Amino acid sequence: MSTSSLRPSERVLLQRVRNQLIDYLEIAASFEAQRDFQTQAPETHVATEVLEQWADWVSSNWREELKTPTFSEQERNAITLFQSVWQDTHNTLVRPLPALDYIQLAPAWQQLRVAAEDCLRVFMLRGKLSDVEEAIG
């Protein structure tokens, strides 16, 4: 068997990225999940992780990268809306970011949480896709 046949297809790789976005949104959309993350990883600055992880998965060229049919048009629209709020939040908050308990009081952080919740709701219409096989449709 050649090594090229072991490499996942582009679609499967995009499905994995999509699943990672769902994981991210589940944390960004929930103050409780953020606090749980902080408890489980006390050495991690969760506010920074929540703010910066989005950029790890969604580049400035995301419209060309996060393609249909892996990402539905509804999901792409939800990303556009969340990206706008994320960018505003990213540009508004002071650095270094305060501790999680304090940043959760900030209006910009609260708006980010609501936007993440809205985006997640759209993604969960289809839920997570396979990490190993191409999803149909």
Predicted features and spans:
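Structured alpha-helical bundle/scaffold domains in large eukaryotic membrane-trafficking regulators
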Residues: 94, 124-135
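Intrinsic low-complexity, intrinsically disordered or marginally ordered coil/linker segments
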Residues: 1-3, 131, 137
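Short, flexible helix-adjacent loops and helix caps
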Residues: 33-37, 94, 98-101, 128
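Positions within ordered alpha-helical repeat solenoids
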Residues: 30, 88-91, 122-125
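Amphipathic protein-protein interaction modules
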Residues: 58-118
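Short terminal alpha-helical segments
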Residues: 1-61
